Amino acid sequence: MKNWKKWAAGLFALSLCLTSVSLPAAAEGEEDIALIADTSEETPVADGTPDETAGDGEADAEEEATRTETQEEIEITAEQVTQYMQKKNSCDGITFYYRPEDYEDTISDEDVVDLLDDIELAGIDDATGEVVCTLEEDSDNSDFVVFLSPESRWLVYMDPEYTKVTMVRQIVSSLDNELLFRSRDNKTLELYNKDYDEVERSYTTDGAVKDGKVTYTNEDSWQVVLADTYDAVISSARFVTENDKLALYVDDDTAVIGLYDKAKDKMWWSTPENVGHDKTATNTIVEDLSSSLKMVYGEPDARSTTNMRSRGDAKIKVKDKSSGVKITYSFKKAGITVPVTYTLEDDYLEAKIDTADIKEEDTSQSGKLVTSLSMLSNFGAASSADTGYFVIPDGSGALIRFNNGKKTAKSYTGYVYGSDVTAVAQTEPAVTEQVYLPMYGIVNGDNAMMVVCTEGDSNAKLTASVSGQSKSSFNICGFDFTVRDSDTYYMSGDNSTALTVFEDGDMKTDTLAVRYYPLETEDTPDYTDVAEAYRNYLTEEAGVTGTAEDTDPGLYLNFYGGTIKEKSVLGVPVKMKTALTSFEQAEQILQDLSDGGAENMKVQYYNWTNAGISGKVDLKAKAAGCLGGNSDWKALQSYADSNGVTLYPATDNETFKSGNGYYTFTDTTVRISGSYARIYDYNLAYGTQSTANKPLSLLSPATFTEIAEKLTGNNQDKSLSRVSLGSLTTALYGDYGKQEISRDKAQQLLEESYQKITDGDITLLADGANAYALPYVQEITDVPLQSSGFDVFDEDIPFYQIVMHGLKSYAGSAVNASATPEETVLLSIASGSSLHFDMIGEETSTLKDTALDGLYYASAESWTDYAAQSYAFSKAVLSGLGDQTITGYERNGDVITTTYANGTVVETDLSKQIVTVDGKAYAMADYVEEGSWNEA
């Protein structure tokens, strides 16, 4: 054996074996992101080397899955061994023969001489009489001589005098670890150094087999699990610490993390078990799966990014700490070091990175900057034999079932809290739902886990893939974190060549943290258990308090006051404020609804001020004259107070025009590329940016707290105790100019704004709510009733609603915006959602050629009767349940069964349009007249 063979064996052992992380994924409608690359489709992504122009996906497409166990080719026969070689001794059931020193002179058969040129030692199995190994001398010392077989599957020691064999070891698996060997009786495992002359760690077993596995241990609390065939490593780690519920394990060599759930007798691994034997995976994929940390770094001058994996690309150092370990990953080639702390708490494991501790040797334009990090991003990966699903909080929620056969579908990527809208797309993006909650769930047979991103969530994206996607047989879900974002721009109007620029300066997010909660359940777990665990996290850890005071459902209404419309004045086109729903009309709509039986109405009133109508920053709370002015507004308030109507004046300041002290030149968000962030309409035919309407400016987050303070004062002056902030409870974006506001900082500014408003005794309604808004809002409207519907999804579930029911009052998406309003009513009822309608008082023809022409469906005249009647239906079946949590939700075809904490069972039949509550049937037709929504 030559030195290069030893070097190669050591390198291979470092680059493969017992670890894992996750395979990210690309959401439909986005670029197909392979492995860990987080780049735009225009940016070349290298895999380990910056000069490669193809991304991982292209490389893997060309790389075939050729990973096979190494095999020894025995070319010499037992007869030739016994005839031409010198017998030594029998050791562990094998008789060994040594090559004579003068074999070239004494053997006349040239073919035999050629064979013996590469064979110094041969072993014949005493039981079968067959040659089982041939070996060459590798090294020697004063104690023994080391012999290795050509494929390094056999390791043999002889005494220094070459008189007898003293030890025989056989490799467990070259796919797992080329330095891990077993004794012939399978009682002992030994991990050798790369020179094979020293045992770094040894383990023993009593031979007991459980679930097809054999466990080896040692005095240092290490535990190695082999398949009962002794030819595959299932897992390897040492015990670190424990508490009453959980125990933490780590592999010092590979940084594999294990979390043992004592109650369930379940070990959760950061690496798919037996990953080295994935027959569908390429070497690159196995390395990816075998990495507990993955990183992307960017090179600004080269405008490129490069993937790095802890397996093969990083030196790993493990240090025990109180209740956990700190693992330092040193990516020498990139000049980057990333420390990660893994801490065992009472009922969860936390993985955490303090970005200030990350070391980058060169952060100049010619250096290497960390842009993305993924830690434990395939924790709890499921095999092709497992049964279960991932719970994905996309929109209302969705399930991705393990091994669903959707190999050709794009894997999933969802940006937590939505994508950063400052990076305005050249073409209209696909219409998708948003990830409102920074978490996901794993349900695997009798076990389940809730995973939540507790810090750095504003820069997280959730990825998931099923077996067969990305050339892996595993099902994987996890978080990736963008620590420096990028943007693309085009020079001189050339839209064919995009240039990439990275976010300047230090990483703006201080901490990245993910918690892994194994669930304690008496019965087989499902997604309602995951929802309960997340609800408990919100109330116990995230500062969310229950505000679901109404036991009966509400009727949520969005009124739209006015808009800008071009009219002809003396033949001259003039843009004028135009009423869509005057205050007097709003009162009449409410009265008509009340006359029809509607109760507990909650109104979100958009564009009710002059600033709101004109698109300026809306903070003065001054009623628009075109809607009836201050007197009519006060009359509407008085009516609402007297009739139990909750009125939320809405102010939506995401986009703006100059005025009211804020100007597009100074207060517009700046993109990473350095240009202003302008929001365009898109051409309906071609999907390209339209110039028909002037683009709107995106308001800088730097103004949020100041505006909140002014808004609070003005509302207090006008005795307004409620407000809606429109899209500013769902939209999250940074300002990358002189303000240097990251998404993480923008989230902090939004939370400070919510706090200022609520500290002023003003109640917030959220028109959709990201998780960070939940501690501040009283109730939520426009909660989606479906997911984005990606092909990889198997089923929509009302996960958001299950989390919120009994915690916050909420309504679903607008019934009258749906093409199937009856189904929307029934789905709302099935998910415990109050009903929601959009309405305007004027004819819908008034909307033509205005910014609100998308409200073509919202005629109050057309929908008042239907809204009142469907509310009566909703109240009949959901009365008394508003403060109860949902404990069960199951869909079987068109029948949905919802169970509440007080034992009430609501069965909704979508096809028959009948809802049964504890055995009593309620037919929708008995409440809602046919055609009542389109009589106008």
Region spans (language model):
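Bacterial N-terminal signal peptides that target proteins for export
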Residues: K2-L11
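Bacterial N-terminal signal peptides
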Residues: L11-T19
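Sec-dependent signal peptide cleavage junction
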Residues: L18-D32
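Ser/Thr/Gly/Pro-rich low-complexity, disordered linker/stalk segments of secreted
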Residues: E31-E69
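N-terminal accessory beta-strand-rich subdomains and adjacent acidic, glycine-rich linkers
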Residues: R67, E73-Y162, M167-T547, S911, ...
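Active-site-proximal substrate-binding groove within the catalytic cores of carbohydrate-active enzymes
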Residues: Y84, C133, N243-D244, V250-K262, ...
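Aromatic-lined carbohydrate-binding/catalytic grooves of carbohydrate-active enzymes
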Residues: D552-S638, S642-T703
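Structural preference for beta-strand elements that scaffold enzyme active sites
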Residues: N600-K602, T646-Y648, S721-S724, T763-L765
